[in-house]
Structures are given as structure tokens and as C-alpha cells.
Design a protein with these regions (language model features):
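N-terminal lobe/hinge region of extracytoplasmic solute-binding protein
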Residues: 205-255, 286, 367
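Periplasmic-binding protein-like
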Residues: 11-13, 37-41, 146, 150-164, ...
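Aromatic-rich, solvent-exposed beta-strand/loop patch
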Residues: 34, 190-193, 250, 255, ...
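Structural transition elements
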Residues: 17-19, 24, 29-41, 138-140, ...
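Long beta-strand-rich cores associated with HINT superfamily self-processing modules
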Residues: 170-201
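Surface-exposed binding/hinge segments that line
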Residues: 175, 298-351
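Extracytoplasmic/peripheral linker and loop segments enriched in polar/acidic and small residues
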Residues: 18, 24-29, 33-34, 56-73, ...
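Extracellular/periplasmic solute-recognition and catalytic clefts
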Residues: 94-95, 288, 311, 375-387, ...
Length: 580
């Protein structure tokens, strides 16, 4: 999924005797919607780069088709050249990982276009070998070790310059308890522990109409309520440092990272009281492996699994064997299960349509093993009503705190906030893009680490900032010095102060902050003009001027619009050839 918000920003290129320009580059960025963080960024960087001798020739805010043809879909011949020859120099963009961080899919040297998504054209044998170890590590401590090694390499090499880690803002009832926020946006959190003292009903505002009703074919908006109905073998658990823990499975084990034996809780039942067993798991997984169902990650799943991969050992035990090692095999076990006795016989291509029909006419069919079940979908009034799953406590051990949960489609931000202020709504979705100063008094808000980051992607085949062959002291080390200089000239504090809508944290490496493997020991590249000039000089660029260096004195109109989220969400299991 891609949401893009950019605006063309005019600039004046500084030349003449005021500043010494060693070379010029071009900036590339999407131009979809106005008033984003890159509006602020572009105003600052075009003033800062000339201070270290880098001029801006052109800032190209273009549509995705144009951008794709200069980056991941470049038609050749390869490598992707600089901007003036049809490629790019620096590309301003945001990336996000839904769940599991897999940098090899972006930076492995074998995956440069046309073979993959490494449009950075970054090549480092040490990175490749470390990424191999990471992707084949199936013990969590080993993954953590290799993940931090990868971040150390990216921190040193800077194939891309990570600008910021944005946070999501959720306004909510001041007494809300039990919300573990990191996975809510990814529709990976169940609400059985949510509570507000003295309240038995919870209401949530969404900015989109209800459209998807089958849990294995849904988006974020419908995913948040469908997630309360269904359940998986494993889950990502914020209370376990965002690692995998058992849900419907009582245990899972592997001796080689390829074959997993899974024990299912024998007490688990569906919301109609029917026993949940291994045949339901087999049914769900074979559904996703059936081309007629058109599962969005079908290509990735069929790379590692076939129908023969799932073997039922007994009613509550099965074995799943992967055809080859993959990053995070547990991720396959976080898929929500659907009841075979409800869905068996429905044509594979008709699941989504059937789910919508049942939601409107017979909601008792929309059941899973989650804490809640569908009581009503009111199409005319635009709300979803969930009630407790009466069997959930019997196998899970505790009952959901709320008796009823409502999800309302509320069209505008102001309406949603007014409803929160009046007590009609208990929580407002982050997609309304609400600023801190808009949160009603008497309510609260939570800022949540996200799965995304903003960056300046570098063309590592650019002769100066990539290969360094055209630097006065030619070589890759000089290119690295130039990239370090650029990183130190980004005025992150100025940009954060000018943005004023969301809390941004300084970007360090291209790994999201909500990853359990994020290395918080790495230090940001603080703004330091002296250090930036020093790195330029190490690359052979000698500054002649001895005049005082101008300080940052930018006047930027505070942004009052959406938090841009110019983010391509990357599922490591599926190449996304163009944003949608």
C-alpha cells in the first residue's frame, strides 16, 4: 500500500561568489498531494547543501510512473545512471515494513534492477554475507545478532540517508487501558485486554467506509475490526519485545528452521462452539495456496510452501515444511485461521463476495476464534457492532473486558474529534491525521512508533556520491565521505520544529523503530557544518572561502496538513513493482 503526499516547492539555486559549488545534483520526489514533510525538507536542503559545495540543479516532483522509470522500473541499459542521463541522483521517499525487517530485499547486490528492488544499486559483499546469515537464522538471538550487524554496516556505508522516524497519533479516552499500540496499525492486535473503568462499550472512529469482510482479503480499515473476530497460531506480542508468542498454538518447534511441528490448543473452539483443529489450519493454508483465491501474497507463499507442505499428524498437531529457508518463517504462522465447516464449499473466487453477503444478511457466519464476533453490519448507518465470543474465555483463560465494540465510519476529522470530546467515541484512528494541538481537552493521545521511515535514497552508481570516481580523491571511500557530509548537513531539528504536526525522531539507519531488532545504541548524525565540511575535504574538496559560514535562518510556514506518510509499505515476501 502506498500513500503519497508531496508538493512542488520553488527554490533559488545559489551561485556566484556567495558559496563555492563543487558539483551539482538533482533531487527526485513524488508529487501527489500538497503539504507534507517533504515540503519542509525541500525548503531546507536546497539552502543547506550549497554550504558544503553541493548545488541543486533541479528538484523534480513527479508522478509515480515517471519515478518508477528512473528507479526500480528503469528500462535499461544498466546500471541506473545519474538523473541527467535518465536515472536519479537522490530520491526523497518513505519506506515501511509491515512486520518483519528484511533489508536484503533492498540492498543485496544480486537484486539490482532488473533482478530486484535494489534501486540504490548498493553492493557490499560483507552486507550480502551478513544478510544471508540473518535470513537463515531461525533462532531469535541469532537474528538479533545479525540484524544489528546489518545495521552497523548500513550505518557505516550509508547507501541511503535515513531522515526521520515518524510516529502515529491516536486520540483516545483518557482512561483507556490495555492497549499495546505498536501492532494496531498493522492490524495485528487483539482487543480482549482493552478496557475503560466503568464502561462496558467501546467505540472507534474510522475515516473509511466498510468495504472488506473476509479477513484474508482486507485493508487496514476493515482489518482492525476483523482482527477481533479471528485468531492465528502465533502472534506478535508487544509484551514480549515485539516477538512471536503462541496464540492458538500451545507450542511450536523446529530443529532446522524448515520443518515446524505445531501443537494446537485442544480446548480452542470457534465462536459457534465447534472444535478448532488441524483440519482448519490445513484448510486455511491451502486456500492461500490456491491461485483462484487470488491471495495478495500468493507468489511469496508458493515460493516456500505447497499443498504437500502441510501434514496433519493428529487432530491437534500438524507439521509445516518450508521448501527453503526464509526470513521469519513464524510470520507464516500469524495468518488468521478461518473455520472449515463454515467456508468449505464456497468457490475459491467468491470468498470476499460471500463474506460481504453474510455480513449484511447472516452475520452469524462471520465467526472466528477471536475475542469478539460480528453482531451487526449496518450499511445505512455505517457501523460495525461486535459482541463477545461466548467461548473465548473457555480456552483463552480470560474474557474480553468490553461487552460491545462499535466501529463507526465518520467522514471528517472535525466530526470524529467532536464525537471524542462528547464521549460518543472512545478512540480516533490515526488516518485522520490529527495534530497534537487538535486533540480535545479532557481526552488523551498516544504517539506510536511506526514501521516506516523517511530517507534520501542514494544512487550508488552516481560518479560522485555513489562510486566516488569523479571525486578529487577518487574512490568509494570519498563517496562515503560525501554521503556523511550530506547526512551532517540535514537540519533535522529545524525540520522537526517547522513540521509541528507529529513527533519526528531523527533517522539513523533504514530499520523502523518498532522492529524488535532496531539498534538503539547507534547515534544520530547531528547537524554539524564543520564536520560536514571536514568530510568533503577528506574527499578532496577544498574550501577556499574564509568568510563566516551562515547559520540556519529559515523561515518556514508551519505545516497544518496531513502527516504525509509518503510510504511504500514493503512486504518482504512480495516485490512491489509500482506503488498503488
Amino acid at each position: 500500500m502506498l500513500v503519497s503526499l508531496f508538493l512542488f516547492v520553488p527554490f533559488n539555486r545559489t551561485t556566484g561568489n556567495e558559496q563555492q559549488i563543487f558539483f551539482e545534483i538533482d533531487l527526485l520526489a513524488p508529487a501527489s498531494c500538497p503539504l507534507t514533510i517533504y515540503n519542509v525538507f525541500s525548503n531546507t536542503i536546497v539552502e543547506e547543501l550549497p554550504k558544503i559545495g553541493i548545488g541543486i540543479n533541479e528538484t523534480d516532483f513527479s508522478g509515480w510512473a515517471h519515478i518508477a522509470n528512473r528507479t526500480w522500473n528503469y528500462p535499461g541499459p544498466y546500471p541506473i545512471p545519474p538523473y541527467d542521463k535518465g536515472g536519479y541522483d537522490i530520491f526523497l521517499i518513505g519506506l515501511g515494513w509491515w512486520e518483519s525487517w528484511n533489508p536484503a530485499s533492498l540492498y543485496n547486490s544480486s537484486l539490482m534492477p532488473p533482478n530486484g528492488d535494489n534501486f540504490y544499486q548498493y553492493a557490499n559483499p560483507l552486507f550480502d554475507s551478513t544478510a544471508h546469515n540473518y535470513s537463515h537464522a531461525w533462532l531469535n538471538n541469532d537474528r538479533l545478532h545479525w540484524a544489528q550487524e546489518l545495521q552497523a554496516i548500513l550505518y557505516e556505508d550509508l547507501p541511503t540517508i535515513t531522515l526521520f522516524y515518524p510516529k502515529d497519533l491516536y486520540p483516545h479516552h483518557v482512561a483507556l487501558e490495555g492497549w499495546n499500540s505498536p501492532f494496531w496499525m498493522m492490524t495485528k492486535e487483539s482487543m480482549e485486554n482493552w478496557s475503560i473503568p466503568g464502561k462496558s462499550t467501546f467505540s472507534y472512529a474510522l475515516p473509511a467506509e466498510f468495504e472488506y469482510f473476509f479477513v484474508l482479503d482486507s485493508d487496514h480499515y476493515d482489518g482492525v475490526w476483523l482482527q477481533q473476530i479471528y485468531n492465528a497460531l502465533l502472534t506478535l506480542d508487544p509484551l514480549a519485545n515485539n516477538n512471536y508468542t503462541s496464540r492458538l498454538a500451545t507450542s511450536y518447534s523446529s530443529s532446522d528452521g524448515l520443518t515446524y511441528t505445531i501443537q494446537i490448543n485442544p480446548s480452542a473452539v470457534w465462536a459457534d462452539g465447534v472444535t478448532l483443529n488441524a483440519s482448519d489450519v490445513e484448510f486455511t493454508y491451502k486456500l492461500l495456496l490456491t491461485p483462484e483465491f487470488r491471495y495478495k501474497d500468493y507468489d511469496y507463499w508458493t515460493k516456500y510452501l505447497t499443498n504437500d507442505s502441510i501434514v496433519i499428524n493428529n487432530e491437534f498437531e500438524l507439521t509445516i515444511t518450508f521448501s527453503e529457508g526464509c526470513v521469519f518463517p513464524e510470520d507464516f504462522l500469524t495468518i488468521d485461521l478461518v473455520p472449515k465447516h463454515i467456508w468449505e464449499g464456497v468457490p475459491y473466487g467468491n470468498f470476499s463476495a460471500q463474506a460481504k453477503d453474510w455480513a449484511e444478511k447472516d452475520p452469524s457466519k462471520i465467526i472466528g476464534a477471536g475475542p469478539y464476533m460480528l453482531a451487526e453490519y449496518n450499511k445505512s448507518a455505517n457501523f460495525i457492532h461486535l459482541i463477545k465470543n461466548p467461548y473465548f474465555k473457555d480456552w483463552f483463560g480470560s474474557a474480553p473486558k468490553f461487552n460491545d465494540i462499535y466501529f463507526y465510519y465518520i467522514t471528517t476529522k472535525s466530526e470524529a474529534l467532536n464525537a471524542l470530546a462528547s464521549g460518543e467515541i472512545d478512540m480516533v484512528d490515526t488516518q485522520y491525521a490529527i495534530r497534537v494541538d487538535e486533540v480535545p481537552s479532557g481526552t488523551a493521545y498516544t504517539l506510536v512508533n511506526t514501521e516506516s521511515y523517511y530517507e534520501m535514497a542514494i544512487n550508488n552508481y552516481h560518479p560522485i556520491i555513489g562510486t566516488g570516481e569523479h571525486c578529487p580523491i577518487a574512490g568509494k571511500q570519498s563517496a562515503k565521505y560525501v554521503r556523511r557530509a550530506i547526512n551532517h548537513i540535514v537540519p533535522r531539528e529545524v525540520i522537526k520544529n517547522a513540521w509541528g504536526a507529529y513527533l519526528l525522531e531523527d533517522g539513523i539507519v533504514p530499520c523502523p523503530q518498532n522492529s524488535p531488532f532496531f539498534d538503539s545504541s547507534l547515534q544520530p548524525f547531528n547537524y554539524n557544518l564543520t564536520k560536514a565540511k571536514h568530510y568533503m575535504e577528506l574527499a578532496g574538496y577544498i574550501f577556499q572561502s574564509t568568510s563566516p559560514t551562515p547559520s540556519i535562518s529559515l523561515t518556514i510556514t508551519p505545516i497544518v496538513a496531513l502527516m504525509g506518510a509518503v510510504v511504500i509499505f514493503l512486504r518482504f515476501r512480495k516485490r512491489q513493482k509500482k506503488p498503488t
